[in-house]
Amino acid sequence: MIISTKKGAPQAELDRIIDNFEHQGLSVTLIRGTDYNVFGLVGDTTKIAEKDVLANPWVENVTRVSAPYKRANRLFHPDDTVVDVNGIKIGGKSPIAVMAGPCSVEGEEHTLKMAKLVKAGGANFLRGGAYKPRTSPYSFQGLGTEGILDLVKAREATGLPIVSELMDEAHIDEFEEYVDIVQIGARNMQNFQLPKAVGKMHKPILLKRGLANTIEEWIMSAEYIMAGGNENVILCERGIRTFERATRNTLDLSAVPVIKEKTHLPIIVDPAHGPPSSSARSAA
C-alpha cells in the first residue's frame, strides 16, 4: 500500500502516521518529495480500510500495490535512485557510466595493463572476475583472493573503482573490504541466500538478470537485497536464453524501458554475452 500526503504535512503528523502503522506490524518507508511525501507500507495491509486512512486530512491518496515487489517499485519511490560510487553517479540523469575490463583476472601485470587501457578508452570502472562461475569444473575458476588484490593494485594505479563478482557468502568480508561494486551474477540471481546476504553489505550491488528469468523474477531478486537493508542496487541486463542458436544469448534491450517504468533502480546493459565470438563483439 502507498499513501501520499498533501503538500505541507507537518513532521509531527508524518511521525504519527508512521507510529500508527508500525504498531499494526507493518514496515513503513517514508520517501520525501519536493512537494509531497509518500509512505510505502510492506506487510499484510488487507485489514486496513482505505476510507479510514483517507479520513486523515493530511492524506491525499491511497493506492494498493498488486505487484509482488514493493521496495523496488516505482510507486513506492517515484524518483530515480542514483547510486554514488566514489563520486561517480549511476542512474537518473547522470552521464552513462562505463564498466570495462578482463573477464578473468589473470595476474597483476595483465590487470594493470587492462586497467590503463580501459581508462584511456573512457571507462569509469574496472571490472574483473577473481572468482569465476564456470559451466565445466575443469575450466579456470579464477585466482580468488590473489585476483582481488591484483584489482586493488590496479585501482591504486589508475583511480578506477572496481567491480567483481561474489559467488559465496564466505567471501563477503573480503569483498566488503576491497571491492567497490559487488556483482551477483546471472547464475546466482535466484540463489536467494546470496541476495539475502548482500542485503546486509554496505557496498552497491550489481544484480545481473538470470539466463532464463522473467523481468518480475529479476526485480524480486532485487527485492531480497533491498529487504535486507541495502537499497543501492543496480540492475544489469546481459541477455537471456532463447530458441536462437546463432548467438550465445539474446540481449533483451526491451527490458530497459520496462525496468525504468516499473522500478526506480538504475539499469545498465552488458553486451558481451550476446555475440557468439570476440570478433562479433568487436564488430558490434
Residue ranges and their predicted role:
Residues 50-65:
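Short acidic amphipathic segments
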Residues 8, 95-113, 137-141, 161-165, ...:
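Active-site mouth loops of central-metabolism enzymes
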Residues 140-164, 197-204, 253-268:
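Alpha-helix-loop-beta-strand connector modules within alpha/beta enzyme cores
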Residues 94-96, 122-124, 156-162, 178-180, ...:
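Short, well-ordered coil/turn segments that N-cap beta-strands
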Residues 67-99:
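N-terminal amphipathic alpha-helix/helix-capping segment at the start of soluble metabolic enzymes
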Residues 85, 201-284:
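Catalytic alpha/beta core domains of metabolic enzymes, predominantly
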Residues 127-145:
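Glycine-rich, proline-tolerant flexible connector loops at the mouths of alpha/beta enzymes
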